[in-house]
């Protein structure tokens, strides 16, 4: 029974066998044309190569720069902290434990004010925005830098 199962007609394409005589349609040069770099074994050009003319990516001007002094923070918005209980001490370890952040970046955690905070929370984080500080103080919370 199982040995008789076959795929539907047209479901499996027959592989094109190369270099098997002129009658096959892909004999002799096997679809690679006559001589040249592309006909050789392992031959070909690198991505972006345009035959010797200045490539497109070199013709367009450079833009921007990479700031080596950039500080990277794990961002937490106030709206994401609604799941916490009142009077909780919010620090990096708690945020990781509750899966509010995936990882702690080199400079720690920064609190931003997106979303609404209704619970009184105490924060001990690396950095915070002015607006976040205002919203935390408004609901009776406390924030300090560790």
Swiss-Prot record:
Keywords: Ribonucleoprotein, Ribosomal protein, RNA-binding, rRNA-binding. It comes from Phytoplasma mali (strain AT). Pfam families: Ribosomal_L27A (PF00828). Belongs to the universal ribosomal protein uL15 family. The keyword Iron does not apply. Residues 20-30 have a biased composition (Gly residues). Binds to the 23S rRNA. This is Large ribosomal subunit protein uL15. SUPFAM superfamilies: Ribosomal proteins L15p and L18e (SSF52080). GO terms for cellular component: cytosolic large ribosomal subunit. Part of the 50S ribosomal subunit. It comes from the Bacteria. Residues 1-46 are annotated as: Disordered. PANTHER family: 50S RIBOSOMAL PROTEIN L15, LARGE RIBOSOMAL SUBUNIT PROTEIN UL15M. One of its GO terms (biological process) is translation. Disulfide bonds: none annotated. Residues 9-19 have a biased composition (Basic residues). GO terms for molecular function: rRNA binding; structural constituent of ribosome.
